[in-house]
Amino acid sequence: MITDTIANAHRYTALHPDFSDAIKLLQTLDFANLPDGQVACENPNIRLFIGSEAMRNREAAKPEAHRNHIDIQVPLSGTEAYGWIDRGRLQNGLGYNEQKDIEFFDCEPTTWLDIHVGEFALFFPSDGHAPLVGSEPFIRKAVFKIRTLETRASS
């Protein structure tokens, strides 16, 4: 997991061949004027979703993990808390959904952190994460889904 400010996101471009394109979008798109839904990306290894999501409390938040995608999650309208747990410590998997590349787990995160507007959280497949935690009823956010090195389309 990596957290940082959007202004510093360029520091991480060397970690993955598609991070440069994702970070360029992160730093240049006018998210306030984009409608909710999927945003078209030229790079076939990146999908971007913008939406308003219901928030929950920590007790209701259960970790999720992905196998084939890296998430960059960006709160656009407020503070979002994230639970984190190393994938090796996840317990009680509730079944992997291959089509959505997601599995939820019935266990507790080991760490919590707050991400504010102007910041992002980057989650690799090794990172179990429990997003959408906070005191507001809803949050508007952007989520980048970037294919892992093993599953990406060649350029």
Model-assigned labels for residue ranges:
Residues 72, 120-122, 137-153:
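A short hydrophobic beta-strand segment most commonly corresponding to one strand
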